[in-house]
């Protein structure tokens, strides 16, 4: 029944206590929009959600990280740091310890360089890999159409991302940079997402 469906718990729990207190977690079919100003730790945030203790990968979720802004090796390095509690300098100095600590989540995390790719490509990857969680870093750069109005571009890509989440029963986490209008504000809205 509809009442039973609304009582479903989220399949994947957040591992960040302050977030977990406000949001139960995520499940297939969810589109999660995450926005922040430049150089504020967006990639480290999703690395922590996925790879740190009790993160989605530790819970058994198959996670795909589609990176189109930073080099995929830099993104992967953040995940290694998050899962090992080691800086990259410490990882280089003790690769065997880093490998041992990263191993429990390594099979559940796949990285793909997505530079220049669009939402149709994202859908083909999701269809083939069948992930539980997809991270789009950065979501707006996957837009297949371009318009003078960034809201039109973002809306089309976000609708496609939402449809992917529903059709393939995965959670899609859409990372986005926020415009200067969002600087120092706590009351944010979708119009502040850059396209």
PLM features: residue spans?
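The Walker A/P-loop phosphate-binding site
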Residues: 1-85
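Short gly/ser/thr-rich secondary-structure transition/capping motifs
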Residues: 12-17, 116-117, 187-191
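Conserved catalytic network of the ASCE P-loop NTPase/AAA+ motor domain
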Residues: 24-26, 55-58, 101-104, 126-129, ...
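Phosphate-binding/switch region of NTP-binding enzymes
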Residues: 25, 39, 156-195
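Generic beta-sheet signal
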Residues: 30-32, 63, 131-136, 170-174
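Non-membrane alpha-helical structural segments and their capping/turn regions in soluble enzymes
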Residues: 43-44, 151-155
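Aromatic/hydrophobic pocket-lining residues that form π-stacking "cages" and hydrophobic walls in ligand
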Residues: 49, 122, 161
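Conserved inter-motif catalytic segment of the P-loop NTP-binding fold
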Residues: 59-148, 156
């Amino acid at each position: 029944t509809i009442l039973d469906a609304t009582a479903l718990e989220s399949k994947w729990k957040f591992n960040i206590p302050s977030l977990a207190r406000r949001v139960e977690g995520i499940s297939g079919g969810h589109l999660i929009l995450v926005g922040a100003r430049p150089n504020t730790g967006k990639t480290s945030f999703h690395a922590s959600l996925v790879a740190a203790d009790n993160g989605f990968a530790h819970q058994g979720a198959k996670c795909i990280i589609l990176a189109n802004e930073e080099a995929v090796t830099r993104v992967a390095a953040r995940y290694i740091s998050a899962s090992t509690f080691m800086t990259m300098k410490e990882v280089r100095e003790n690769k065997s310890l880093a490998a041992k600590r990263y191993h429990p989540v390594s099979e559940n995390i796949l990285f793909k360089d997505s530079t220049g790719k669009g939402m149709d490509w994202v859908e083909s990857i999701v269809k083939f890999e069948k992930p539980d969680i997809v991270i789009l870093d950065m979501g707006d750069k996957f837009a297949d159409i371009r318009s003078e109005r960034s809201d039109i571009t973002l809306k089309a890509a976000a609708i496609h991302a939402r449809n992917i989440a529903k059709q393939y029963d995965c959670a899609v986490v859409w990372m986005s940079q926020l415009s200067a209008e969002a600087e120092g504000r706590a009351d944010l809205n979708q119009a502040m997402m850059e396209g």
